[in-house]
Swiss-Prot record:
SMART domains: HATPase_c, HisKA. This is Uncharacterized sensor-like histidine kinase R01002. Keywords: ATP-binding, Cell membrane, Kinase, Membrane, Nucleotide-binding, Phosphoprotein, Transferase, Transmembrane, Transmembrane helix, Two-component regulatory system. Pfam families: HATPase_c (PF02518), HisKA (PF00512). One of its GO terms (molecular function) is ATP binding. It comes from Rhizobium meliloti (strain 1021). Residues 246-466 form the Histidine kinase domain. PROSITE patterns: HIS_KIN, PAC. PANTHER family: HISTIDINE KINASE (PTHR43711:SF31), TWO-COMPONENT HISTIDINE KINASE (PTHR43711). It comes from the Bacteria. The modification Phosphohistidine is found at H249. Its main location: membrane. Residues 173-228 form the PAC domain. It is a multi-pass membrane protein.
Length: 525
């Protein structure tokens, strides 16, 4: 019976016994003595109350027997523990024996960098490593707490956490620390990458920690320089955005006046033009102003896209109607060039949910460029079709085409493919860049196929249900541009630069800053 109780006690107590380390041997010794007492006590548990029933009534014998059994068991347990301990006499102190570590010093000396062996508290027991002498020239004696005390105060917690992870049965730990340098030359701290490996006994108890430290100061310096350059580039980009926004708004006011007054002159509202040369000059003024306003608007849109502040206004509209509107705006340009402009929209294409203004900007830029770089007698075709939930918009032409080695340059702001043909045409190289930006904002993309002398095919795909529209959450503060007082007068009201608006402007002396014409929107960059 006692043997059975002993095995049951072993099974119940095993999870609570320490696996090793300080005090584990004492705990196991005490447990063996308590186990013997428990086996005898559990065997005597039913006997003591039954024996008392011979002298006492049952109602009194059972509680009295249980109390007597419990008291006797506790006394026996205390006596067993006290009898098995040897207490130190005055002046004597007990120390747990130091764990025996495997002799791997010869191997440690072959490792690169600085190798330190630490106890479970992080104190250094020994120093090794192929480059140990070089490291020791730059630091104080690392033995004991010397290593920890030379770590930058902000990094000590991370170092101790790495050691704690090894105590919790982790098989590897690594940490970046800054180690104080004693040398007057160079920076105050060296950046160190410290990789730690535990040494355990057969039962898995942590005996020591081997740390291999490597100086990564040069890598840290390069990373800091890269971060500084990135911050400088971001600052320069922000300054560019501010500059473009300010300059664009500064240009819009005089441009609207130029366009409006050229309309007044061409309409002969204040007197007839005397000859054809005057009419030609007025037309040139209007065309040049329209083109410049288009460039300004495109630059402003590009700056918004790059800054992540171009807000899409998603709404349902019919693709066929949007294409027809763009085709009507550009038909005059195509007729003057002698280029045939056609469009084909499949029956399955009805309404889509997207930003109609951005959609038409994409079309106007692509069709305008196709007309511009197609010779007389050529053909420009616009196709629209649905592929799943994606709208596929294709603009193809029979123009000059693009060499294969130049295709990768397309879509970069202010970059144009230069040859004898393209030099005859004005432009900023912003058109295709704007197309790519607007397509990506919708969650779409742009692809280009072209061969020199054969023409170009540009395919734009965007989701028809706005499912891929980018969610732009501007964490940074918006770019604020302070405009001169005259540009603030009509900040909330948009006016057309046509004759009615000019009639009021001529009386008030003010011109709205947001004026524009359909023709201005039709010109491409």
């Amino acid at each position: 019976m006692a043997g059975r109780w002993t095995s049951l006690v072993d099974e119940a107590a095993a999870p609570w016994l320490p696996r090793g380390g300080l005090g584990s041997a004492i705990a196991r010794h005490d447990f063996r003595r308590l186990r013997a007492v428990a086996a005898v006590s559990l065997t005597a548990l039913p006997i003591v109350p039954l024996a008392l029933t011979l002298a006492l009534p049952v109602s009194a014998a059972l509680p009295a027997g249980a109390a007597l059994w419990a008291s006797a068991s506790l006394l026996a347990a205390a006596a067993a523990i006290a009898g098995g301990r040897e207490f130190p006499t005055d002046g004597e102190v007990e120390f747990a024996p130091a764990p025996e570590l495997p002799d791997l010093n010869a191997a440690y000396d072959l490792f690169a960098g600085l190798v330190t062996v630490h106890d479970t508290r992080g104190h250094v027991l020994s120093v090794h490593g192929r480059d140990a002498s070089e490291y020791l020239k730059l630091m104080r004696d690392p033995h004991g707490r010397g290593f920890i005390e030379q770590i930058h105060v902000s990094d000590r917690i991370a170092f101790l956490r790495a050691i704690d992870s090894l105590r919790l049965d982790s098989e590897r730990s690594a940490v970046d620390i800054r180690l104080e340098r004693t040398s007057a030359d160079g920076p105050q701290f060296a950046h160190i990458y410290c990789e730690m490996t535990p040494l355990r006994d057969a039962e898995g108890n942590l005996l020591a920690i081997v740390a291999q430290s490597r100086d990564v100061s040069e890598e840290a310096r390069l990373q800091a320089e890269a971060a500084a350059k990135a911050a400088h580039a971001e600052s320069a980009n922000d300054a560019k955005t501010r500059f473009l926004a300010a300059v664009s708004h500064e240009l819009r006011t005089p441009l609207n006046a130029i366009l409006g007054f050229s309309d007044v002159l061409a309409g002969e509202y204040f007197g007839k033009l005397e000859n054809d040369r005057q009419r030609e000059y007025v037309s040139l003024i209007h065309q040049s102003g329209t083109h410049l306003l288009s460039v300004v608007n495109t630059m402003l849109d590009m700056s918004k896209i790059e800054a992540g502040r171009y807000e899409l206004l998603l709404e349902p509209f019919r693709v066929a109607e949007a294409i027809a509107a763009c085709e009507a705006m550009l038909s005059h340009q195509a007729r003057e060039k002698g280029v045939r402009l056609t469009s084909r929209v499949t029956r399955s294409v009805g309404e889509i949910n997207a930003d109609q203004r951005a959609f038409q900007q994409i079309l106007i830029n692509l069709i305008g460029n196709a007309i511009k770089f197609t010779d007389r007698g050529g053909l420009v075709t616009v196709d629209a079709a649905l592929e799943g939930n994606m709208l596929k918009l294709t603009v193809s032409d029979t123009g000059i085409g693009i060499a294969a080695d130049k295709l990768q340059m397309l879509g970069q702001p202010f970059v144009q493919i230069q040859n004898d043909y393209t030099r005859r045409y004005e432009g900023t190289g912003l058109g295709l860049s704007l197309v790519k930006g607007l397509a990506e904002l919708h969650g779409g993309d742009v692809s280009i196929r072209s061969a020199e002398g054969e023409g170009t095919v540009i395919v734009v795909t965007i989701p028809s249900d706005a499912s891929g529209a980018a969610e732009r959450q501007c964490a940074d503060a918006p770019v604020t541009v302070e405009f001169p007082p005259r540009l603030k007068q009509h900040a909330d009201g948009k006016r057309e630069a046509g004759v009615p608006a000019l009639s009021e402007a001529l009386h008030t002396g003010e011109i709205g800053r947001e004026g524009g014409h359909g023709a201005a929107q039709a010109k491409t960059a």
